[in-house]
């Protein structure tokens, strides 16, 4: 799948910088408001076994307007919302659904294609595009990061993802320094002093990453995460619960994916 987005080689940063992902659309139309309301209500709808009922009530032409009006940032937000709703729909009942209804499948697949991604809950949608700062004046750290959307909610799910947000932020310097080394070699300017400086930055960045990893057990119980949270992020290809894959209604000639 070819992405429509272009890497700016003049500004290589990490996967998470100081700029927060978009949390809400402004001046929402009725479909955009419905999408946001449903995505925000996922924990309550899963608790009451109403998620499929609410989504099945949407019309087949839900969110059928032109995607060209959205910026990349807005498309990434929409992809987060559709991804969470799709996975909640498939896995949010006693048995997984073999078919994803057209109201979610069609716009989700189009948005994902526009972003150059498969229509699945990816790490980008689950983590990289799914957080905000509690206090805008503070940095990206475990005391100041919260999720925008989740499945069941609760400390274990939120902590698991916010740890990864902060890990990606801590790894920024390693990515920038790695790129700096590559550029130095390409320009035949990879002196010992440049290599030492950038490799030292990479080491310091990885030390911060490891420090954050060690904090995972503080607020994320492995049993709770594995049995209550993780099932919602499963894919479907070769999954025992959906051995033939998932049918995206109205997409891919309705062949299981």
Per-segment meaning from a language model:
Residues 1-257:
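Surface-exposed peri-terminal alpha-helical interaction modules
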């Amino acid at each position: 799948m070819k992405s429509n987005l272009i890497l700016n080689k003049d500004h290589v940063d990490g996967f998470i910088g100081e700029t927060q992902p978009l949390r809400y659309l402004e001046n929402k139309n009725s479909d955009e408001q419905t999408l946001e309301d449903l995505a925000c209500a996922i924990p309550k709808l899963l608790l009451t076994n109403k998620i499929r009922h609410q989504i099945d009530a949407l019309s087949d032409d839900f969110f059928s307007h032109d995607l060209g009006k959205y910026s990349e940032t807005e498309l990434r937000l929409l992809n987060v919302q559709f991804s969470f709703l799709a996975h909640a729909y498939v896995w949010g009942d006693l048995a997984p659904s073999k078919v994803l209804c057209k109201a979610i499948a069609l716009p989700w697949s189009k948005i994902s294609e526009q972003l150059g991604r498969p229509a699945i809950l990816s790490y980008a949608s689950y983590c990289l595009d799914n957080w905000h700062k509690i206090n805008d004046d503070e940095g990206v750290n475990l005391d100041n990061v919260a999720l925008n959307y989740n499945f069941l909610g609760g400390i274990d799910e939120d902590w698991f993802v916010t740890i990864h947000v902060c890990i990606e932020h801590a790894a920024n310097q390693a990515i920038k320094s790695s790129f700096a080394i590559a550029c130095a070699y390409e320009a035949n300017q990879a002196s010992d002093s440049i290599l030492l400086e950038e490799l030292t930055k990479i080491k310091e960045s990885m030390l911060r990453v490891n420090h954050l990893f060690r904090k995972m057990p503080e607020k994320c119980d492995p049993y709770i995460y594995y049995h209550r949270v993780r099932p919602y992020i499963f894919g479907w290809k070769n999954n025992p619960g959906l051995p033939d894959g998932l049918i995206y209604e109205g997409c891919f000639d309705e062949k299981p994916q």
